Amino acid sequence: SENRGSTSITDDDLFLRMDVSRNTLYVGESLTATLKVYARVNLVDVQGKKIPPFDGFLTEDVKIPQIHLEREEYNGKIYDRVGVLQKTILFPQHAGTLTIEPYELFANGWGVVVVVSLMTFSGIPVMSGYSARANP
């Protein structure tokens, strides 16, 4: 049997990152959350274990036809395999702190679990005289 334990993948080799267009917004305004995988190892059989629950947000998924891997620099390091796994437009449904739960990923059949950190957002109530408008 093959010894898969001889190859260890570090947090720098494979991780997920949720890019958001902003962290503070008015109730009814939107933000875009883009889930990206960053890898310095070959990626085979990438599968999300669970989609992050966007509790407190109305969501609209943006269709991603397939994962297209590109080269990108992040925190001073070059990653040859960076791809968008999911893109979602989020609309906060109430004021206060809103949270996106961690996300888990299995890759390369090794059962490697990569987790996106917990994220929080501030939903600001709509002010008197201000009408929330959808962002283009």
Predicted regions and their residues:
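Surface-exposed interaction/ligand-binding surfaces
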Residues: 1-136
